[in-house]
């Protein structure tokens, strides 16, 4: 594109002017029944949407690349672009083509971005769609999150990359705003949907003024006084949201300052490893939320996911949730409530569209049905004190029910522009216009019949043509007898044509009745949205309460269906006691019965060292413990015979790793980073899961690191810890440090094949069954046979008994223990001969350690 607009046609000059204002967005330029894209936008859209790329003449001497999409199908294409992280500026024709002397006037009426969409067709029904902003100042990150469709506005501050990663993992923003002067750690800087904005948009003073103006307050103290960096992020976010919506945001009436002291903290690795809302391969099925979610409304499903990602520490809130779930289970009240919830739509997002004045007719019919269902919904709830406040928030809206019921027909068309939305009887003027438009023929017959009776003129006819409109025609013979109120309009050879005041009034109405009816209907619809919006705050409050009830009813239903129990929440005791616990997800996908297991950790037993074969169930046992603790901190029932759970401040997991290729980190580096985060941040109130620390390096390095990490957790941090390992040397820790005990997953061997019993028993495992697991994995039998030979050979070498401390003892070796330097030219000695028979790639950690003792004996 050339900067010299004079070389372009007037229409293309108009387009280029609009495009210059939206350089980072695809411009949908309305031309008749199509949205057209030009130049680079056309090429990009053709590639992303798989539509035809053509040319439209020339501009500035070069062919213009062009692609188009039908106006009526635009929503489908917008949805695809938004999912790809693209933003679209929609330029509509706002002028009358009949009156335009040059190009029809156009302007951008809305900007559709991944984080600011509110149209039903562009949103995932059961997933939050968040616009977020992050502002970095000296490693202090101000963070803001806005659910535009629901009007939910949150701010917080986190410190350091780990906390930021955890927060973004929880929020999972559809669109993320950052200052052009700052990047973000990890994958967030370059992911689709991340926008770099001018640094001045994050100015704290300007942001504070904008927020105060939005909320109509003098200062932000009433919202908990967010930190300066959080204010900067919130101001940038609010400004961007207003820019994209081309107007005010009346449903954004306040913000919530989120405190991490109120929640059980989980880092990004923990959220992934526990598979709360997504599995490790990105699926929603077979997650904790998948098991918990039997909600009836979309807004309830979204709230449930937020609860899962933010378990609470507030004992009052948790106890109330438990009481409500217990009350709903009495007499199966939850079933009655869920039957009514079936009739309630997505009030939260409908009200967001009402506030943005983008609600469609069917939104209003769904809102009407939802509000109509509130009284019977309240009637299903138990007469318990724990529901009083919730019932008050749900409320009842008889005036809105009556208004919407009389204003909109039961099954309206999709769009107001199609007409036929406003119900008969709502507006006399509209009813009259519709009657004229729909019954013009009958009205003309009625006028003709009445005029004939009045005048007694037999040749009288009421007719119409495009030139003269409606008229009364009389023969030349009878024209002299026309009444005095007949005004002559046209004289013909054999007839005279007249107009009367009544016919003139009908003509004025009939010729424009259809267009007038549609214009009036649009005005009535806009006024109707204003009337609904007058109760917006109370309606939003009701929607939030209904969503909360939906989640509680879902948790009650799940507890009954899955045989879960309410855990005892303990304030004055550090304890995790689970009797016959089950993994909530694995239990649902197993064909066989799940083997339950118990756990008891308290001040006297802070750590359990878990050993046993691969695939024996160590990771499942650890994860089920974390998930049961998390469920308790939701206020939910848990999969166990009984449970007592003390208050936790954090849940950490170090389970499994893979290379971080994008970040240039090896498996071992990822493992050590996660371990470092745990050792630096865990407290005595934390639950820590450590699985196979030290696998990614040499045997002695790994064993030493695992030993030291376990020792630090037990001796210094005193966290509740489940520590799974294949280093059998760690089973000696209980003999050296208090508060540690051993447990193992049982297995048996039959016909050289391993049978996993999945039962946890106290004490260390007797062996690792490495060859049997390899056989199950399909390792060739020849390799298994050779490994068995080597194993027997190593076992017969009678290694020295392992020492009571890890191989890499902190004590420096004595000079006498230093090995002599070997000559390069000596004949092979016994050690060298023994080494030639060893293949380190085929040894388990235990076998490698035993081989080392054998070599030591040969010195």
From Swiss-Prot:
Ranges for region Disordered: 797-822
GO terms for biological process, alphabetical: mismatch repair
Keyword flag DNA damage: yes
Gene Ontology molecular functions: ATP binding; ATP-dependent DNA damage sensor activity; damaged DNA binding; mismatched DNA binding
Source taxon at top rank: Bacteria
SUPFAM superfamilies per record: DNA repair protein MutS, domain I, DNA repair protein MutS, domain II, DNA repair protein MutS, domain III, P-loop containing nucleoside triphosphate hydrolases
PROSITE patterns: DNA_MISMATCH_REPAIR_2
Record keyword DNA repair present: yes
GO CC, alphabetical: cytosol
Residues binding ATP: 612-619
Keywords: ATP-binding, DNA damage, DNA repair, DNA-binding, Nucleotide-binding
CDD domains: ABC_MutS1
UniProt record similarity statement: Belongs to the DNA mismatch repair MutS family.
Function: This protein is involved in the repair of mismatches in DNA. It is possible that it carries out the mismatch recognition step. This protein has a weak ATPase activity.
Alphabetized PANTHER family for the sequence: DNA MISMATCH REPAIR PROTEIN MSH1, MITOCHONDRIAL, DNA MISMATCH REPAIR PROTEIN MUTS FAMILY MEMBER
HAMAP family for this protein: MutS (MF_00096)
NCBIfam families: mutS1, PRK05399.1
Name of protein: DNA mismatch repair protein MutS
Species, as recorded: Alcanivorax borkumensis (strain ATCC 700651 / DSM 11573 / NCIMB 13689 / SK2)
Underlying gene: mutS
